[in-house]
Amino acid sequence: ISLRRRTDIPMIWDELANSDAAVAQLISEDAAEGVGLKISKNGGLTPCRRQRDICISAGYSLSVQDTVGSDIAFAAIAHLGQTIPAHLLRCILDTRDMVSITTADAASAEKGNFDRHSGWITASEAPGLGIEPRMEVLGEPVKTYR
């Protein structure tokens, strides 16, 4: 039985929408109107892209967030948020104010950083996430892959 049919209060799944299976169950049980995608909790950008596509196909509203953030996390949030149709995007969370250190800078002055205008954020057009990590802040890598 659908929880949505028992109340007129809109339901958004947040912490429970943490995998492809959870999102599929949410939709199959008609349990909510939307999902809050948390990139680090959901396994990174690739799983979140799949979950985004599943939710968009079902007409669910989406927010893109993370549990806590940094400049690097926010770059991923902003880029994923831009891939959601405006009529389904509830919000993205600017996680940069959650930490007191700066972990990255804009990759290119010409391509810009994250611009805010009329309640929307536009991600950089520079390659990748459009940022240059501050390695002096991050320190040496724990592991590298080639």
Regions found by a protein language model. Give the residues of each.
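Shared catalytic-loop signature of beta/alpha-barrel
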Residues: 1-10, 17-120, 124
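Extended hydrophobic packing segments that form well-structured cores
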Residues: 129-146
